Amino acid sequence: ATYILDTSKMLTRELKLELEKIFVKGQNFCNLYITVMSFGFKYGIPSDSDLVFDVRFLPNPYYIDGLREKTGNDPEVQDYVMGNEKAEQFLEKLKDMTEFLIPNYILEGKNQLVISIGCTGGKHRSVTLANALYKVLEKQENYGVRIEHRDIEKDTITKRK
């Protein structure tokens, strides 16, 4: 066998990351793979989070009729969220923190980092800020990065029932 993986104690997410490291070609990074995850606090904090940030201090687009059914993937919601000075300040502070932490995690030998950003439902504010952080991190070449919006569809599914 070319590769041997002991999956007996792996979470599904960990197995996926290990397989991506082996089979995703053209990746040139130092064994650190970062997941930027948005989530809704009402569904619980992701158990595999290393860093958790709460953006519920920002105005909630849910209460704006034209934005309620949209998500942080939509430009209108992104403009609303990032149009708030506090959102820009938060992103700058988050960029500063990750610029400090990531090289230190690499030196420590950490191979997986989950940065979770949460709001109430995981649909608007957290998605917007997670996307913004992902765009910053994907510009670097010494680690891999992916985005996941864990709860983006949960309210929609619940309301259909």
Model-derived features: where do they sit?
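Post-Walker A helix-loop "phosphate-sensing" segment adjacent to the P-loop in P-loop NTPases
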Residues: 134-144
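A short glycine-rich beta-strand->turn/loop micro-motif centered on a GG-aromatic cluster
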Residues: 144-152
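Catalytic cysteine-centered active loop of the rhodanese-like fold, especially the PTP/DSP P-loop
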Residues: 112-134
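Residues in well-ordered beta-strands of folded domains
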Residues: 37, 118, 148
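C-terminal accessory "lid"/substrate-recognition subdomains
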Residues: 2-113, 138, 151-156, 160-161
